């Protein structure tokens, strides 16, 4: 039907004024060369168009448009939209739903929907102002933007197929929300891929995003971007089941895995059972005034948050008010040596806990610039920090540092104008090799230092530096103190107390 390269409407279903129109079944088993349009014919449409079933089983070489345009108050109801064939648009959207009173109950693609256009409008599927209950893709959707939600709403989007953005522009994304667009629930067991952004919300809101069963989100620039002042609700990544080729559920990028831009927010991030968040710069990055208000839980053997030249987890001016827990064999790592970086005016107030056998931070916990950690840092249950806690610049740590349960951390360093006001405690069977304090701040390390470990601990207090709360050794190994600064007294009036069988050398 139609001629090759035809760009006009071949199937045109329309209504005007207060008309009521019902299209019971439109099924294509052949080839349509041109557009398929279901719409109002005039701008003053106030009636109702109903499409019970639209189904493409073969080939449509053109756009499929279903919408109410202009300022019309009319209604378009679509019960079922099924594509098991191929829809190919040479320009513009492959499939386009439009209108504030356009409602789609079910959209299913098991075939191919592709736009070969090169402009911003050349998305695979676009939803503008319309509402959709269920979006299911087990086929392929491709365009400059894969799926574009522009001031529309999708209740549930399930992808077990392939959604691809072909554009390299910084606005191109596999799935994109803009102009107030929302997706309440995304379940990805397939692949969402982009030459730019995997999933992006530039103005809108994601509710819950679940990645499982080998599902992958990949973006060359970022895996997930939450734009300035926008929202990502809860993110769950479960690596329990991988694909046959060994692909592990996760978020991957050549630059940053997850980015929360200025003022943006997320409620919860949970990574478990071997899931991956990987960026060649940063695994997770929070920018100025970004907020993570819920828990960040990284758990299970093989689970990894991995950075490269940046950090595994980078908080550069953001606020993490929920707890950060790495446990049960999970790893946070970066080739730069920065496992967790808190910088700029960044704040962490919900606590950092590294817990359990085979749980590791491969690199330092760095608190720098004007950043603050106002909560406890706990290394427990056999966990390892293969690096140190480094507080520098004008950084402040007011929570305690606790190493317990057979855990270990290489070192604690306080330098620059840094201040540590919480206590430092190393329990029996745990290990801290050294504490170095060269800070020129008035308080330096103002809390107490207590070593209950049977492993040797070396403490260096530099010229002009201060340890204000006294030093106590209850362990059976040597405690070596090099002091060129000042050491204050503990609650009992003692500067250095040795209750263990090891020697104290000053």
Residue ranges and their predicted role:
Residues 1-35, 39-63, 68-92, 96-196, ...:
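Surface-exposed loop/turn motifs in large extracellular/passenger domains
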